[in-house]
Protein backbone atom coordinates (compact mmCIF):
# COMPACT_ATOMS: atom_id res chain seq x y z
CA UNK A 1 0.00 0.00 0.00
CA UNK A 2 1.09 3.56 -0.75
CA UNK A 3 0.87 5.46 2.55
CA UNK A 4 0.30 8.78 0.74
CA UNK A 5 -2.92 7.47 -0.80
CA UNK A 6 -6.20 7.80 1.07
CA UNK A 7 -8.09 5.69 -1.48
CA UNK A 8 -6.54 2.93 -3.55
CA UNK A 9 -8.58 0.86 -6.00
CA UNK A 10 -7.22 -2.43 -7.27
CA UNK A 11 -8.91 -3.90 -10.36
CA UNK A 12 -12.41 -2.88 -9.22
CA UNK A 13 -15.39 -3.94 -11.34
CA UNK A 14 -19.11 -3.58 -10.73
CA UNK A 15 -21.85 -5.45 -12.59
CA UNK A 16 -25.58 -5.00 -12.27
CA UNK A 17 -27.98 -7.72 -13.38
CA UNK A 18 -31.19 -6.45 -14.97
CA UNK A 19 -33.30 -9.46 -15.84
CA UNK A 20 -31.15 -11.52 -18.19
CA UNK A 21 -28.88 -8.59 -19.01
CA UNK A 22 -25.61 -7.83 -17.23
CA UNK A 23 -24.51 -4.21 -17.19
CA UNK A 24 -20.88 -3.51 -16.37
CA UNK A 25 -20.81 -0.09 -14.70
CA UNK A 26 -17.12 -0.28 -13.71
CA UNK A 27 -14.46 -2.30 -15.48
CA UNK A 28 -11.11 -3.12 -13.83
CA UNK A 29 -10.66 0.33 -12.27
CA UNK A 30 -7.24 0.81 -10.67
CA UNK A 31 -6.12 4.19 -9.32
CA UNK A 32 -5.43 6.11 -6.15
CA UNK A 33 -6.46 9.42 -4.57
CA UNK A 34 -3.97 11.12 -2.28
CA UNK A 35 -4.70 12.26 1.25
CA UNK A 36 -5.71 15.94 1.24
CA UNK A 37 -6.16 16.14 -2.52
CA UNK A 38 -8.97 17.80 -4.40
CA UNK A 39 -9.78 15.24 -7.08
CA UNK A 40 -12.18 15.63 -9.99
CA UNK A 41 -13.68 12.53 -11.59
CA UNK A 42 -14.76 13.53 -15.07
CA UNK A 43 -17.01 11.67 -17.48
CA UNK A 44 -20.22 11.87 -19.52
CA UNK A 45 -23.61 10.69 -18.31
CA UNK A 46 -23.72 6.92 -17.92
CA UNK A 47 -19.93 6.55 -17.78
CA UNK A 48 -19.89 5.00 -14.30
CA UNK A 49 -19.11 8.12 -12.24
CA UNK A 50 -21.92 7.66 -9.73
CA UNK A 51 -21.15 3.95 -9.38
CA UNK A 52 -17.58 4.90 -8.58
CA UNK A 53 -18.69 7.47 -6.01
CA UNK A 54 -21.01 4.94 -4.37
CA UNK A 55 -18.14 2.47 -4.17
CA UNK A 56 -15.78 5.03 -2.59
CA UNK A 57 -18.50 6.04 -0.15
CA UNK A 58 -19.34 2.52 0.96
CA UNK A 59 -22.84 2.74 -0.50
CA UNK A 60 -22.13 -0.17 -2.82
CA UNK A 61 -19.60 -3.00 -2.88
CA UNK A 62 -17.69 -4.03 -6.01
CA UNK A 63 -18.40 -7.27 -7.84
CA UNK A 64 -14.66 -7.91 -7.88
CA UNK A 65 -11.45 -6.15 -6.91
CA UNK A 66 -10.54 -4.28 -3.75
CA UNK A 67 -11.00 -0.75 -2.41
CA UNK A 68 -8.57 0.39 0.27
CA UNK A 69 -9.21 3.36 2.56
CA UNK A 70 -6.22 4.33 4.70
CA UNK A 71 -4.76 0.96 3.79
CA UNK A 72 -7.80 -1.01 4.97
CA UNK A 73 -9.84 -3.13 2.55
CA UNK A 74 -13.39 -1.77 2.83
CA UNK A 75 -14.67 -3.94 -0.02
CA UNK A 76 -14.78 -6.90 2.38
CA UNK A 77 -16.74 -5.00 5.05
CA UNK A 78 -20.07 -6.20 6.40
CA UNK A 79 -23.12 -3.91 6.14
CA UNK A 80 -22.60 -2.82 9.74
CA UNK A 81 -18.95 -2.02 9.09
CA UNK A 82 -19.88 -0.05 5.96
CA UNK A 83 -22.43 1.96 7.93
CA UNK A 84 -19.79 2.83 10.53
CA UNK A 85 -17.32 3.67 7.75
CA UNK A 86 -19.79 6.11 6.13
CA UNK A 87 -20.73 7.72 9.43
CA UNK A 88 -17.18 8.28 10.57
CA UNK A 89 -15.30 9.06 7.37
CA UNK A 90 -17.56 10.24 4.56
CA UNK A 91 -19.56 13.41 3.94
CA UNK A 92 -21.86 13.31 0.91
CA UNK A 93 -22.91 16.31 -1.19
CA UNK A 94 -25.59 15.69 -3.82
CA UNK A 95 -26.73 17.56 -6.92
CA UNK A 96 -30.22 18.25 -5.55
CA UNK A 97 -29.17 18.97 -1.94
CA UNK A 98 -31.36 16.27 -0.28
CA UNK A 99 -32.28 18.55 2.63
CA UNK A 100 -35.16 17.79 4.99
CA UNK A 101 -37.81 20.37 3.94
CA UNK A 102 -39.47 20.55 7.37
CA UNK A 103 -36.19 21.34 9.16
CA UNK A 104 -34.34 24.66 9.28
CA UNK A 105 -30.83 25.01 7.92
CA UNK A 106 -29.40 24.64 11.42
CA UNK A 107 -31.54 21.58 12.14
CA UNK A 108 -30.47 19.95 8.86
CA UNK A 109 -26.85 20.40 9.89
CA UNK A 110 -27.51 19.20 13.45
CA UNK A 111 -28.98 16.00 12.05
CA UNK A 112 -25.57 14.96 10.73
CA UNK A 113 -23.75 15.72 13.98
CA UNK A 114 -25.97 13.31 15.91
CA UNK A 115 -24.18 10.36 14.30
CA UNK A 116 -20.69 11.79 14.70
CA UNK A 117 -18.12 10.95 17.36
CA UNK A 118 -16.31 14.26 16.90
CA UNK A 119 -18.66 16.86 15.34
CA UNK A 120 -17.71 20.43 14.54
CA UNK A 121 -19.35 23.45 16.17
CA UNK A 122 -22.52 24.18 14.17
CA UNK A 123 -22.47 28.02 14.45
CA UNK A 124 -18.84 27.96 13.27
CA UNK A 125 -19.75 25.72 10.33
CA UNK A 126 -22.65 27.98 9.30
CA UNK A 127 -20.34 30.99 9.49
CA UNK A 128 -17.69 29.23 7.42
CA UNK A 129 -20.16 28.59 4.61
CA UNK A 130 -21.48 32.16 4.76
CA UNK A 131 -24.94 31.39 6.21
CA UNK A 132 -24.61 32.32 9.88
CA UNK A 133 -27.69 34.58 9.62
CA UNK A 134 -29.79 31.99 7.75
CA UNK A 135 -29.74 29.17 10.28
CA UNK A 136 -33.43 29.55 11.15
CA UNK A 137 -34.61 29.55 7.53
CA UNK A 138 -36.22 26.54 5.88
CA UNK A 139 -34.98 25.16 2.53
CA UNK A 140 -38.00 26.59 0.68
CA UNK A 141 -36.95 30.07 1.85
CA UNK A 142 -33.47 29.69 0.39
CA UNK A 143 -31.98 29.88 -3.10
CA UNK A 144 -30.48 26.83 -4.77
CA UNK A 145 -26.98 28.04 -3.97
CA UNK A 146 -27.86 28.56 -0.32
CA UNK A 147 -29.41 25.10 -0.11
CA UNK A 148 -26.26 23.58 -1.56
CA UNK A 149 -24.20 25.46 1.04
CA UNK A 150 -26.39 23.97 3.77
CA UNK A 151 -25.84 20.54 2.21
CA UNK A 152 -22.08 21.13 2.31
CA UNK A 153 -22.32 22.33 5.92
CA UNK A 154 -24.23 19.16 6.79
CA UNK A 155 -21.50 17.09 5.15
CA UNK A 156 -18.58 18.73 6.97
CA UNK A 157 -20.29 19.20 10.36
CA UNK A 158 -19.76 15.58 11.34
CA UNK A 159 -16.04 16.15 10.67
CA UNK A 160 -15.40 13.44 8.05
CA UNK A 161 -12.07 12.83 6.40
CA UNK A 162 -13.57 12.95 2.90
CA UNK A 163 -16.23 14.91 1.02
CA UNK A 164 -17.76 13.03 -1.93
CA UNK A 165 -19.62 15.48 -4.17
CA UNK A 166 -21.93 14.18 -6.91
CA UNK A 167 -22.43 16.91 -9.55
CA UNK A 168 -22.50 19.65 -6.86
CA UNK A 169 -22.97 22.44 -9.42
CA UNK A 170 -25.31 20.52 -11.73
CA UNK A 171 -28.51 22.26 -10.58
CA UNK A 172 -26.94 25.73 -10.26
CA UNK A 173 -26.32 28.65 -12.58
CA UNK A 174 -22.72 29.56 -13.45
CA UNK A 175 -22.19 32.29 -10.85
CA UNK A 176 -23.67 30.24 -8.02
CA UNK A 177 -21.80 27.15 -9.18
CA UNK A 178 -18.47 28.97 -9.00
CA UNK A 179 -19.25 30.08 -5.43
CA UNK A 180 -19.89 26.45 -4.46
CA UNK A 181 -16.61 25.36 -6.07
CA UNK A 182 -14.76 28.13 -4.20
CA UNK A 183 -16.29 26.86 -0.96
CA UNK A 184 -15.26 23.27 -1.69
CA UNK A 185 -11.71 24.40 -2.44
CA UNK A 186 -11.66 26.41 0.79
CA UNK A 187 -12.75 23.33 2.76
CA UNK A 188 -10.02 21.33 1.06
CA UNK A 189 -7.24 23.86 1.57
CA UNK A 190 -8.13 25.29 4.98
CA UNK A 191 -9.66 22.26 6.71
CA UNK A 192 -7.46 19.63 5.10
CA UNK A 193 -10.37 17.55 3.87
CA UNK A 194 -9.94 15.28 0.87
CA UNK A 195 -12.56 16.40 -1.66
CA UNK A 196 -13.74 14.28 -4.60
CA UNK A 197 -15.97 16.00 -7.15
CA UNK A 198 -17.88 13.89 -9.67
CA UNK A 199 -18.89 15.91 -12.74
CA UNK A 200 -19.56 15.85 -16.47
CA UNK A 201 -18.46 19.50 -16.70
CA UNK A 202 -14.96 19.40 -18.19
CA UNK A 203 -13.74 22.91 -17.23
CA UNK A 204 -14.14 22.05 -13.52
CA UNK A 205 -11.18 19.68 -13.88
CA UNK A 206 -8.92 22.74 -14.08
CA UNK A 207 -9.29 23.31 -10.30
CA UNK A 208 -8.24 19.78 -9.37
CA UNK A 209 -5.02 18.47 -7.86
CA UNK A 210 -5.86 15.16 -9.52
CA UNK A 211 -7.95 14.50 -12.63
CA UNK A 212 -9.53 11.09 -13.20
CA UNK A 213 -11.39 10.49 -16.46
CA UNK A 214 -13.87 7.66 -16.81
CA UNK A 215 -15.50 6.44 -20.02
CA UNK A 216 -17.86 3.47 -20.36
CA UNK A 217 -16.84 2.23 -16.93
CA UNK A 218 -13.11 2.34 -17.65
CA UNK A 219 -10.55 4.70 -16.13
CA UNK A 220 -8.87 6.27 -19.17
CA UNK A 221 -6.80 8.88 -17.35
CA UNK A 222 -5.47 9.47 -13.83
CA UNK A 223 -3.05 12.38 -13.62
CA UNK A 224 -1.83 15.04 -11.24
CA UNK A 225 -2.49 18.67 -12.11
CA UNK A 226 0.48 20.63 -10.80
CA UNK A 227 -1.03 24.06 -11.51
CA UNK A 228 -4.68 24.06 -10.33
CA UNK A 229 -6.74 27.02 -11.54
CA UNK A 230 -8.68 29.22 -9.12
CA UNK A 231 -12.38 28.27 -9.48
CA UNK A 232 -13.20 31.97 -9.91
CA UNK A 233 -11.27 31.94 -13.20
CA UNK A 234 -12.98 28.87 -14.65
CA UNK A 235 -15.63 29.43 -17.31
CA UNK A 236 -18.19 27.08 -18.82
Regions found by a protein language model. Give the residues of each.
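Short, Lys/Arg-enriched, disordered terminal segments
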Residues: 1-4, 235-236
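ABC family nucleotide-binding domain
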Residues: 5-214, 219
